[in-house]
Design a protein with these regions (language model features):
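Residue-level detector of structural "landmarks"
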Residues: 2-7
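Short, positively charged and aromatic/hydrophobic N-terminal segments
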Residues: 9-11, 18-26
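Nucleotide-activated donor-dependent transferases that construct or modify glycoconjugates
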Residues: 31-50, 75-77
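A short, glycine/small-residue-rich beta-strand->loop->alpha-helix junction that serves as a flexible
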Residues: 43-56, 82-84
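A short, Lys/Arg-enriched amphipathic alpha-helix followed by its capping loop at the start of a domain
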Residues: 59-69
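Hydrophobic anchor at the start of a short beta-strand
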Residues: 69-71, 122
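A conserved catalytic-core segment of Leloir-type glycosyltransferases
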Residues: 77-141
Length: 141
């Protein structure tokens, strides 16, 4: 089930829709249900400058995690995100797969970094064809 959250960024005058996918998986005890959350956002602070969208991307997952839910946060790895400064490293078990988009086989590379103050990990979807640009929402060539 997707829960749309709408946020406006006055600087770029666009509406962005953020979807939180909540997956309910059964545990060994059939009476209990563990909630696992997959959070995918276009911006997460501190990896991109503060904005309404980046702040939602930063603090909403932390709030969900503090309520004892298991959460995974994902965002694109734009060219402006510094791998060394943010201590990104590749997640071998998630990388190495391919994704087919419009009949073109593309490699999937996932990197991860931590927000230590929140004890939270952020996974980055890395693909040069789609995200390797200095600007977030437009391709400045």
């Amino acid at each position: 089930m997707g829960l749309p959250i709408e946020a406006k960024d006055s600087e770029i005058s666009k509406k962005m829709i953020i979807f939180v996918v909540i997956l309910s998986l059964k545990t060994n005890n059939m009476d209990n249900s563990v909630k696992r959350v997959l959070f995918v956002n276009s911006e997460i602070f501190p990896y991109l400058p503060e904005s309404p969208i980046a702040n939602i991307g930063r603090y909403l997952p932390q709030g969900i995690q503090e309520r004892k839910k298991e959460i995974r946060s994902f965002m694109p790895r734009y060219g402006c995100i510094n791998e060394r400064k943010n201590q990104l490293h590749e997640v071998i078990r998630l990388s190495g797969m391919n994704i087919v988009i419009n009949d073109v086989d593309r490699p999937l590379v996932i990197t991860v970094a931590s927000i230590s103050s929140a004890r939270m990990q952020v996974h980055f979807i890395d693909n040069d064809d789609y995200f390797h640009r200095k600007s977030i929402y437009r391709d400045d060539k």
